[in-house]
Regions:
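Generic alpha-helical structural context detector
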Residues: 12-16, 98-102, 171
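A short beta-sheet element
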Residues: 38-104, 113-114, 121-125
Length: 175
């Protein structure tokens, strides 16, 4: 997102950054109403309660994928290795913020410290710089990026289906 003009702000100045609450992995299930996000890219399991509303950005705090940026459409349990970005100020289009953070995901991942169980400290996430254009521009960018993401997801689904069809036809051909 080079070339975006606006004000440089710290992430912690435009959203509340809240670390999740750890729950014992022994009480997680393989299915349930709410997924549990911890330090990974995929859910750690499922739980009967949620502690974070849907339509929330999360950033993985610990583990090999710390710094991974995700948009959670549904309510979820934010675990002890997960930062949730809440209560965005009125000057922020939340979808624009998500796309901006996703674009800078490698930079966020570079904030990790430690080698055994790497993590990203809250102070580093709080001070992460964001270029914030006017709210109207944010909304325009977000609309374009949402449309592109939607189309990319469809294209990926089509590619996966073509791959399945190809494998099926290859099996039929060589039976």
């Amino acid at each position: 997102m080079t070339g975006v003009r606006g004000n440089s702000v710290r992430l912690g100045d435009i959203v509340q950054i809240q670390k999740g609450k750890q729950i014992n992995s022994e009480i997680l299930s393989s299915a349930g109403p709410y997924y549990v996000m911890n330090g990974g890219i995929t859910p750690s399991g499922y739980y009967s309660q949620f502690n974070t509303e849907g339509n929330t950005i999360s950033i993985s705090e610990g583990g090999n994928s710390c710094g991974y940026v995700q948009f959670n459409e549904k309510p979820y349990w934010s675990g002890g290795h997960c930062y949730s970005l809440l209560n965005a100020r009125p000057i922020v289009d939340y979808r624009f913020l998500f796309h901006t953070l996703k674009y800078h995901q490698d930079d966020i991942m570079a904030l990790r410290i430690g080698s055994g169980l790497p993590n990203i400290q809250k102070k580093d996430i709080v001070s992460f710089p964001i270029m914030l254009p006017s709210l109207d521009e944010q909304r325009r960018f977000a609309s374009v990026f949402d449309t592109l993401s939607f189309r990319l997801n469809i294209a990926e689904q089509v590619r996966v289906n073509y791959e399945k069809q190809k494998k099926y036809l290859m099996r039929c051909m060589f039976i």
